[in-house]
Design a protein with these regions (language model features):
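Juxtamembrane intracellular "pre-TM" segments in multi-pass secondary transporters
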Residues: 1-32, 217-219
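A short structural micro-motif
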Residues: 38-39, 192
Length: 219
């Protein structure tokens, strides 16, 4: 059904998008996946210098390799999802499993004893991250009514602007315990959130059922 977007100031438009998401479980869950990724997942990047210098004794070269590993995985993930997106049998389930996989891979990386373990783990982290977040973005753009799409996408973009806060949290935990523990906890939170959402039949059905049908009650 047609959902008129009200004119108003920027704050009012933002709050309208926030209200829309808050009243729709599917879109709230998709935004939550991006939010948890920013606050607890990708915050690991802040701690990579510690891994390169203190744990792997590889200095700036190791730091560069760790960063590059994520980039390579992200590139492969982008190419993969672009190639097989229309052939994924269960898009919703695949998305949530990708998010859970990201958390588990971060936990694996956090305990990696050597660069030989850390680099492949980060390649897979980059792959999983891009693979599932591309799907999140696609479902939001396809499912949100035209009049509200910009407002909801602004919330999605806001999640990425919270990366520094995630880095601050990771840094504080690393200072209190250590960097391995900080990334382990972050990965566990990301995985737990995804696995919890995986129990929802509505989310697993994304891609089989038109997403707008899940939001028809909005007014």
């Amino acid at each position: 059904s047609h959902i008129p977007a009200r004119d108003g100031h920027v704050l009012g438009q933002f709050l309208e998008g926030l209200s829309f998401v808050a009243h729709n479980f599917v879109f709230a869950s998709l935004i939550a996946l991006a939010l948890f990724n920013s606050l607890f997942g990708l915050s690991y990047v802040t701690l990579l210098p510690i891994f390169a210098d203190c744990y792997f004794a590889s200095g700036s070269t190791g730091f560069g390799l760790l960063n590059a590993a994520h980039g390579v995985g992200a590139l492969v993930g982008t190419l993969t999802i672009a190639t097989i997106a229309t052939r994924i049998a269960r898009p919703g389930t695949t998305l949530l499993m990708g998010a859970a996989g990201l958390g588990i891979l971060l936990m694996t990386f956090s305990q990696g004893p050597t660069m030989a373990v850390a680099i492949p783990a980060l390649v897979l982290v980059g792959f999983s991250n891009t693979f599932y977040l591309t799907q999140v973005s696609t479902f939001i753009q396809q499912g949100v009514p035209d009049q509200l799409r910009g407002r909801v996408l602004s919330l999605y973009s806001l999640c990425w602007n919270l990366l520094p806060i995630g880095g601050l949290l990771a840094g504080a935990l690393a200072a209190a315990v250590d960097a391995r523990f900080a990334i382990l906890c972050g990965g566990a939170v990301v995985a737990a959130n995804a696995l919890l959402l995986l129990t929802s039949a509505r989310l697993r059905a994304i891609g089989h059922v038109k997403v707008p049908s899940a939001v028809s009650g909005y007014s």
